[in-house]
Amino acid sequence: MKSFFNNKAQTLINLEIKKGKIPKLIKINFNDYFKNKKKFLNKISVLFRNKKIIIRSSFSNEDTNRSSNAGKYESYLNIKYNDVNEIDLKIKRLSRLKNQIRGENFFVQEMVKDVSFSGVVLTRNLENYTKCININFFDGKNTEAVTSGKTETKSILFFENDRFKIPKKFLNIYLCVKEIIQFTNEPDLDIEFAVNKKGLVSILQVRKIVIPKKYKKINLDYKNLFLN
């Protein structure tokens, strides 16, 4: 069976969810861009009119079924939609992060506005690979705080059970994660998200957690645990 996970951009393009949203994006081939910059810069300015954008890698060795290379490549945030010089500069810089860009892609995506908190949710505890809902988050506008390792980040660890519910703050994220699991038919996920002040969840990235073939399994004798 073919994996749902191809590369960062295509995974988001293929994903269909109702419990959250995928910020508008366009995937562009590096070779196509450098052959006709004017065409693509104009396309970006029209598609993201009056918006701020983020330029992100979508290389073939990222977010596949076998490896993630999470955090290996830089993203460029808060660029004005019509600042063609800055957009071109960042695309050039991104292209230099890989030795060979033939057949490789990047994507441009709308920045999420009015962010209340953001972070990463895992469906496994990466220390022992126990199944759970592990949410690492940052209260504030910085959507890269968790992935960049800022010390102000917080975490909760929730084990699904019949007695206790996940805190209301994280309910929409939880529902969105369950929907993505069902859509992708993949229970082991690493998902980047941002939640705005109205509680709307934006999904920024979805990758498969690569589970080692051998790891020490732990049998839990408790049903609910929160770590703050």
Q: What do the predicted segments below correspond to?
A:
Residues 68-90:
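Flexible beta->alpha loop and helix N-cap segments adjacent to enzyme active/binding sites
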Residues 37:
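Conserved N-terminal catalytic/coupling substructures associated with nucleotide/phosphate chemistry
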Residues 40-42:
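Basic, glycine-rich
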Residues 9, 13-16, 23-29, 44-75, ...:
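ATP-grasp fold ATP-binding core
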